[in-house]
């Protein structure tokens, strides 16, 4: 899943500057090493995927090409990239070290999540444009399931050309067990994010809030059209 958004920010001289923001589900970007604390055995040399260094480097190269193609089309690197399905900080460091992405000088905003498979969400951002002021990870709560574990919501905030921005990236629970049976989980995540967004705008109506992620729902579904 890849989503590209363009927006403009008025500069100090009242001229609008176009910027690109991207969300990219990296679809199981795992390293080749077994993490004894998560269920990542599938992505090891002896696992079901026979995941080895050659396959890992090829995947990194493919991701590099996609992001560089976006930069080529827009004539500039995206200023913020939200990502999901990444195993750890190391795989992100490997990604931003790819030759065609080095020029962007991306920095990372990442937190480990309690997800059983060990996958996280995170941000890559250009510090020359987005002036980071802070970040946090927030547990997504489903009240009906107090022991439920999923990917945390990652947030970061700062300014772009002096304007306040707040970014949120999340990866909502899947449709495992059926769409209708699992809908309440995604609805709960959407409502929690809506509460955060409303709180931010109540505190400062000038804040630009950017919500991105893999919601495992369609725009017409209740979680997106009503709860969010």
Model-derived features: positions:
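Catalytic metal-binding/acid-base residues of hydrolase active sites
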Residues: 27, 87, 173, 215-218
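Bacterial Sec-dependent N-terminal signal peptides
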Residues: 1-16
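A Trp-anchored, charged/polar loop motif used as the substrate-binding/catalytic surface
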Residues: 64, 147-157, 191-198
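Active-site His/acidic residue clusters
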Residues: 37-40, 167-182
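Metal-dependent phosphoesterases centered on the DNase I-like endonuclease/exonuclease/phosphatase
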Residues: 186-228
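Structured beta-strand-rich core segments of catalytic domains in phosphoester-bond hydrolases
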Residues: 86-164, 170-172
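N-terminal, active-site-proximal structural segment of metallo-dependent hydrolase catalytic domains
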Residues: 12-99, 105, 109-119, 190-191
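Active-site flanking residues adjacent to catalytic metal/cofactor-binding acidic residues
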Residues: 24, 84, 170, 213-214
């Amino acid at each position: 899943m890849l989503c590209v958004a363009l927006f403009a920010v008025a500069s100090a001289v009242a001229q609008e500057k176009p910027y690109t923001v991207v969300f990219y589900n990296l679809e199981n970007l795992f390293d080749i090493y077994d993490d004894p604390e998560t269920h990542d055995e599938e992505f090891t040399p002896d696992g079901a995927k026979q995941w080895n260094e050659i396959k890992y480097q090829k995947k990194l190269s493919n991701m590099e090409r996609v992001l560089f193609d976006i930069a080529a089309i827009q004539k500039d690197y995206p200023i913020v990239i939200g990502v999901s399905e990444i195993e750890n900080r190391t795989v992100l460091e490997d990604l931003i070290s790819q030759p065609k992405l080095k020029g962007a000088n991306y920095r990372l905003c990442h937190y480990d999540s309690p997800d059983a498979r060990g996958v996280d969400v995170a941000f890559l951002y250009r510090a020359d444009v987005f002036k980071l002021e802070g970040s946090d990870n927030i547990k997504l709560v489903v009240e009906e399931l107090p022991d439920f574990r999923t990917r945390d919501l990652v947030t970061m905030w700062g300014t772009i050309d002096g304007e306040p921005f707040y970014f949120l990236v999340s990866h909502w629970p899947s449709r495992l067990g059926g769409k209708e049976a699992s809908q309440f989980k995604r609805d709960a995540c959407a409502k929690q994010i809506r509460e955060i967004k409303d709180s931010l705008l109540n505190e400062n109506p000038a804040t630009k809030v950017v919500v991105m992620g893999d919601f495992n729902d369609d725009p017409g579904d209740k979680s997106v059209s009503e709860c969010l």
